[in-house]
Amino acid sequence: MADTDLFMECEEEELEPWQKISDVIEDSVVEDYNSVDKTTTVSVSQQPVSAPVPIAAHASVAGHLSTSTTVSSSGAQNSDSTKKTLVTLIANNNAGNPLVQQGGQPLILTQNPAPGLGTMVTQPVLRPVQVMQNANHVTSSPVASQPIFITTQGFPVRNVRPVQNAMNQVGIVLNVQQGQTVRPITLVPAPGTQFVKPTVGVPQVFSQMTPVRPGSTMPVRPTTNTFTTVIPATLTIRSTVPQSQSQQTKSTPSTSTTPTATQPTSLGQLAVQSPGQSNQTTNPKLAPSFPSPPAVSIASFVTVKRPGVTGENSNEVAKLVNTLNTIPSLGQSPGPVVVSNNSSAHGSQRTSGPESSMKVTSSIPVFDLQDGGRKICPRCNAQFRVTEALRGHMCYCCPEMVEYQKKGKSLDSEPSVPSAAKPPSPEKTAPVASTPSSTPIPALSPPTKVPEPNENVGDAVQTKLIMLVDDFYYGRDGGKVAQLTNFPKVATSFRCPHCTKRLKNNIRFMNHMKHHVELDQQNGEVDGHTICQHCYRQFSTPFQLQCHLENVHSPYESTTKCKICEWAFESEPLFLQHMKDTHKPGEMPYVCQVCQYRSSLYSEVDVHFRMIHEDTRHLLCPYCLKVFKNGNAFQQHYMRHQKRNVYHCNKCRLQFLFAKDKIEHKLQHHKTFRKPKQLEGLKPGTKVTIRASRGQPRTVPVSSNDTPPSALQEAAPLTSSMDPLPVFLYPPVQRSIQKRAVRKMSVMGRQTCLECSFEIPDFPNHFPTYVHCSLCRYSTCCSRAYANHMINNHVPRKSPKYLALFKNSVSGIKLACTSCTFVTSVGDAMAKHLVFNPSHRSSSILPRGLTWIAHSRHGQTRDRVHDRNVKNMYPPPSFPTNKAATVKSAGATPAEPEELLTPLAPALPSPASTATPPPTPTHPQALALPPLATEGAECLNVDDQDEGSPVTQEPELASGGGGSGGVGKKEQLSVKKLRVVLFALCCNTEQAAEHFRNPQRRIRRWLRRFQASQGENLEGKYLSFEAEEKLAEWVLTQREQQLPVNEETLFQKATKIGRSLEGGFKISYEWAVRFMLRHHLTPHARRAVAHTLPKDVAENAGLFIDFVQRQIHNQDLPLSMIVAIDEISLFLDTEVLSSDDRKENALQTVGTGEPWCDVVLAILADGTVLPTLVFYRGQMDQPANMPDSILLEAKESGYSDDEIMELWSTRVWQKHTACQRSKGMLVMDCHRTHLSEEVLAMLSASSTLPAVVPAGCSSKIQPLDVCIKRTVKNFLHKKWKEQAREMADTACDSDVLLQLVLVWLGEVLGVIGDCPELVQRSFLVASVLPGPDGNINSPTRNADMQEELIASLEEQLKLSGEHSESSTPRPRSSPEETIEPESLHQLFEGESETESFYGFEEADLDLMEI
């Protein structure tokens, strides 16, 4: 059969009681299961008796024993009912070749026998047994049957030769120990085979025996042997030798007589007799012959003996065996089959048996389906209260029984057809018609159906149904969702116990709890770099986690992924075998406990809960799907799941806190909930083929000598029930190419990996597979490099827990790009360079003898001649198209560089090419913070690239995909240039020029170049528009509070927002610059009021403007009572202040610590400037020359925000309102403690209405932020820098600096106070006051006014020359500066490519600007 098909029978439920018990034993928890039958009712179906039974013997025994299945039991029941279980033996032994012989296979189940046999057991124990047989066997068998005896401890059994005692024959003895776990025992013969073969030779099993009553002497027969096998926990015994090859030995028929008063009566045997059989003596000549039905023997208990008890009880067992063998129908077995778990001997020899000459057949069996008013399935022992339910269950559980029951009446009325089997022997007294050959449908996995004689040929073809895995195993059930739609939803708020934040509804609270866990993982409190964020499984290494994410949680659909337990498998046959062994048809283990909605997929239940049960009081645990109604209980339960001691279900992705919950979940939910619709109404026995995909299945030849053809149509062999390990998917062609490449490289001697700089002792282990990082664009085939990448970039802790796995590169060996002049000694840097420059095809190794002259920081140029020589030595056309992974050899000669150029694994080369493990395309520190340059590196010119340093060397971005398309290669900025531009956008151009030692004009030119190419779309998944708006709002809020917005804080916040909203994303310098420009986040924009704010911020700004103007109109507030207040915090670095060369950087207006002093500015809408209050942290007397417009408050410990507002209100505002005697309005931001109850009460006491500016809106609607505040800060910066240059060699303390700041404040406030129109227009630009016509000005009009105000005030303060970077550069008068670099770019880029001009390069053009 095809390797992707599995033949399965339409069965609604296959969960046997022994499967439940094995689950419990696996979890080391013993529980009482009420589903297991604990009564002693035994339902027995006998099979045809075809052994040569003498007439006299049959006449004497028929009244007591009319079946070949004997159950020994007593009335005394053991009180320990928890260990009773079901033992099922299914032997479909039709008239064909039986599993054991046609003489009848007795099943001897002993349980506390009668006093005549003595006490031999004390308690029952669980022992399941199954016996199966194929359908296509021959019609007759020459060997008699053997009994099956099940006990709990080994006992001596005399293997007496038939000449001594013919009644001492034991069939199959299943010997187990109390408390021992024994899984199902399956005995499966091959077609045309039998387990008991005629043979010669008798080994001695034991030597002592308690005497028992002898039976009649039997005629001499050939010697027989025993078949001894040790049964492990799970055993499958297959008979493979065809019957035609077995040695047949004829024997003489035997006769024996048995007294009428035999032991079976005293044993309390249960004999089930078929209809038509008489309890009186029956003449075999008159007995009709019918086709033999399949025989199913079912018993409820197995006898148990305590392990420590030996001696006398063992003899009693032997007495019972010998006594039972005195019965003729049980004593005709030619040889015993002993199966013991205490014996180490194994053997399989043939025995001889008598030929059958006379058959006593029975009619259709009668199944005892009643048990105390309940209906019981004869196969799985499932209980039903209604007969119709049992009938429907049996149609799928045991259809062959139903089929034969339907045919019973017609078979009873019709005589049987004589068989063409062997003719009767001359010794037979009377011939009897034998059973015709008929092949019923077996109970499990029917291959084909042979038509019966009375069936039409058209109906003989077996129906076949082909189903996909999704249709057969997966499904969903709506539960009570329809009933819940009628009830109204009432949102319930929840308060987080960690941060006391109140969430609006249950879904927000659930997401908030997950956010706390993610924060713990980022802070390093929880080691989360090996935990899957999708299914919450723990992996041993980040590499295994990455492979799991790619195989299971990738967006690509896979035909080898189990959607129930969320595991991936290497091939479809393994996947199908897993589904057959682990899951049931229509299994839906994920259940919503609120409405009983269930599904086979976890994601469907999760989405269902978030959609249907939103705005309710229910809280869903994502780990075990438990529902809570209390927030504290949910939080405690949620945090307990973060611990290690959880119990994972091996059949799905759920994990539980207690083993009891796990066991209950497996018993209740891992079974068929609802059979697939395709199986409804099918004919019993329909063959169902399961396929993993719709495509044609592949055929794989099976090279097995001992496997019969029919075995290919059976189900695949059983596998372990343990959790499957993730399998790394890889195309077979690529796997073979990789193996060949690894073998070729292994013979090249000692190798060193250029990516991690470690030696490669074992190529398969060092390059196991090609993996991609799910958090960024990093890809590699080096396991050590991948681990290092995860540790360095995706483990969010301040101090790394693990050291990097890189070694220092070997000096003297460098990598050179064959398409440009880029040279480095770090393989990772070269990989980055090749990734971001697709047109650069490969790299080469420069041996130790060659040197590379790089452009130094002193202006030396590169050796262009050497560059051309290298290109001639390794011409680009000789390299493959894709980038290569280069491996350097320690044995390479200095004159001949050794290189192995390999294309990427997904893009396979020609068959003749040799492939090595895939290369390492990387992304520059995506998600993690880009490395900050050191002090020395920041002082370097950006264009001076130190090729040997991995810190300063960065590749050039190529977003276009080619150097000659659309925007030329020169239009793209390198990562280092983008970093400088980002610094200028976060701070300003002047600070960027000072920080990186680059001219401001060059930085502004880079910015213009980048804006010219801004229309290109970035490839890959970056932050969405919603996430970018959240980030833009954060930037605006940070600047309002004078908190730093730089490269580090920006990337940290972007990472946090991206993970919380999107999961996976990318961050780069190019994206960061585009983000700052797209949202107009430059700190000194002159037209900020016209810029578009984020959506939520813009809505809040509109509401604020409407509120303010409405209150001014309704309250008729005068302009003299409308005040705007804001604080300016000044930060002083005393260490920098005490230095000689960095004093100008000591005073800053951005910081995170306690401010050195706070300046409170206040202006009125009529153009008046209120006195400015300065709060100084320290002791200082009032300066004598302090301006009248400034008030000073000094205290050693400083002032809190509430104290600042209280002092300002007392010393400034209340004095002003006392003169006005009118209501007022105070415009202030929402930061600090402006919204505290103390501040609001203070304002209410002075009849002042607070107008609070929403967060992120100050740059547009705060009158002080429009023009005055930024100008004051720039003026203080300018004055301090001038003062720092003058006092470079003199000491300066904070008191002296404060006096200077007070003087400068007085100067700037004097200028502003002399321009009341400027102050009043600030309120108009901020839309606090309406325009002259009573309407709000347009954004363009306000932006023009803002630009005019800034220019006018800077001109009066003489700041225009220092801060004119946003305006158009003025023409220079110097002849040396009249040549613009842009003109040269336009000249060379106008009609041709810049690469065709060898006289100028990017660095040369940049140097002309200095």
UniProtKB/Swiss-Prot annotation:
Annotated crosslink Glycyl lysine isopeptide (Lys-Gly) (interchain with G-Cter in SUMO2) location: K319, K359, K422, K449, K489, K629, K677, K801, K883
Outcome reported for the amino acid change (mutating C817A): Diminishes interaction with CBX5 and abolishes interaction with CBX1 and CBX5
Motif (Integrase domain-binding motif (IBM)): 1380-1404
Basic and acidic residues bias spans: 860-870
Gene Ontology annotations for the cellular component aspect, listed alphabetically: chromatin; ciliary basal body; cytoplasm; cytosol; nucleoplasm; nucleus; plasma membrane
Residue numbers bearing the Phosphothreonine modification: T439, T463, T1368, T1378, T1394
UniProt-listed GO biological process terms: cell division; double-strand break repair via homologous recombination; kinetochore assembly; mitotic sister chromatid cohesion; positive regulation of transcription by RNA polymerase II
The entry's keywords: Autism spectrum disorder, Cell cycle, Cell division, Chromosome, Coiled coil, Cytoplasm, Disease variant, DNA damage, DNA recombination, DNA repair, DNA-binding, Intellectual disability, Isopeptide bond, Metal-binding, Nucleus, Phosphoprotein, Repeat, Ubl conjugation, Zinc, Zinc-finger
PANTHER family in alphabetical order: POGO TRANSPOSABLE ELEMENT DERIVED WITH ZNF DOMAIN (PTHR24388:SF45), ZINC FINGER PROTEIN (PTHR24388)
UniProt-recorded name of the protein: Pogo transposable element with ZNF domain
Gene name of this polypeptide: POGZ
